[in-house]
């Protein structure tokens, strides 16, 4: 199959010009939603009814209300045997899709065969009032029911009908006409919602010692360790080096705990009898509600806990309390750390857990999620492709989810959200997904919402008080290659409340103080981040509607640490991009030294002489040069936010087998021959890296051998040279030495020869430890 040619313009950022806030005309009724396009809706609030007539033979009434506008029809829930029901439900009809000039509200009596007509109320849309916040809500009124011929009948209906926008308070919970095909139990999964990340703490358990342990086997010295469990997190200490009944460890175990504290900390002291066989010598259970909280690095008081021993009597586990062993612990909840639950490269929040340590916010981030264009079909329904798209945005502890737009490749959300900003060097993440749970959350048979694409925007790359309106490409990487799924249009504004405070932040540490005073190891940070993301995804998946685990993991980049040949190549070329200016300077200096451009070389000679004669000008010259470069580049400063770059990511040039390897499970699920081939390829790459690392080590060892007398003749020569150089440099003015060294470096090619220099020859002859390698 021929691959479609790569076109970079498809994956580029495009500036847009939407009519934000209703445009510049007088139609702009509110400034609350000034980063989205205004959407008009007809709202119908059905509050309650009274004095409804009985229609059944039994003399009862099972009423419900049907709101009808053209081909759209929404119904309330029905009540059994109730003549004065209360519904308090809101219906919203998009003005773009209104096909009638009259809205009809019909009260019906639910029946087994055919629902009976009780009465109706009609409204002419031309007479419906307009209402936009911050106006007060429209007060509902009683309306007398009518027959189809216009005659009044018994019964009244309390209603409120108005024209409004998506800024209306009733909008999030309203029944929407574009979701008319969704059953009642699926409506919860399509509404917009705001979620909060649970408050996360690091739990530090300092296991100090135990006393008076009673082993089951008293003929041997016990090999004792402590096992700690918090929910599904399990850690253990090393085996105590003191094989006694009073072992000591003084070892820290770190966990992640989330408020409200539902799990208990369980510690058990165990004796390792043989591999795979351990005896529990005692256990204690500690509630986190009573654990002290620490805001700095000061030591808290330790505490002794009694160890309970459980024995099995007649098949039942009972507590044995003959003699109590004890364990010495220092436990605290660390409030001075920031619990990392997202990749450190894309952090959206850097504040410590304890709110007392938070600094004041420096600004407001506003995000308008407008529309999407050109979305691809994500699933098949009734024999045709369809997409039910929604967006999720995450910044700090606040997650937002837009409503789901049913069956549309160009969905319009026009929803606006705000966040407080505490640090500009943070990233907001916006993801677009396809909703696969429209038939009710539990009826989807384990379906997973499909990812359509993701956008990241770093706040420090934005100018303050400027509105950025762009169409961002939605790009996903599949085993078949890179694929554009469409575009999402966003409006972003970062407003700074104090420029001085924001500038001051650039001089502050990125993470809270405890990360530097009492740092965690790299392995601890990785393990704790994995536990934190697991807790966050579990908690948010229990919300209603749930923010499902696959969504949270995609937004938090859970699999970013997995091996990828493509990412390795991309990172290598990123390093080369960083080093390329240095390489260019080295090439330029080599051309100067070889007099490729005599005029430039002469000018460099003159500059060099000036700097030797006036060395106090060196640093001012360097900083002035950097200043001029920065001012010169200001004209070509980036005017657009950064976006996903397929060329930088090496996504368009990745080999299919490399992509298949990147999407492989862990552990692998591929056939043995493919795994063997990939292992051999990895060995080949690692072999080249091994050679480069070995060469670097060789050069370093040669430097060390200058004074090690490993080669006595070479060291004697070097020591003699150092003694002579010390005398010469002592009696010779420093400026003369620098001047002569510079002239020698910049000498004309006729005074050069192609053979290596004497110092280089000497250095290459020095011994290294490669001779001792197996």
Swiss-Prot record:
Membrane topology: Multi-pass membrane protein
Principal place of residence: membrane
Keywords for the protein's UniProt record, in alphabetical order: Calcium, Cell membrane, Membrane, Metal-binding, Repeat, Transmembrane, Transmembrane helix
InterPro entries: C2_dom, C2_domain_sf, C2B_MCTP_PRT_plant, C2C_MCTP_PRT_plant, C2D_MCTP_PRT_plant, MCTP_C, QUIRKY-like
Transmembrane spans: 575-595, 606-626, 714-734
Cofactor annotation: Ca(2+)
GO BP annotations, alphabetical order: anther dehiscence; negative regulation of auxin mediated signaling pathway
Annotated segments matching region Disordered: 1-25
GO CC aspect terms: plasma membrane
Assembly: Interacts with OSH1.
Descriptive protein name: FT-interacting protein 7
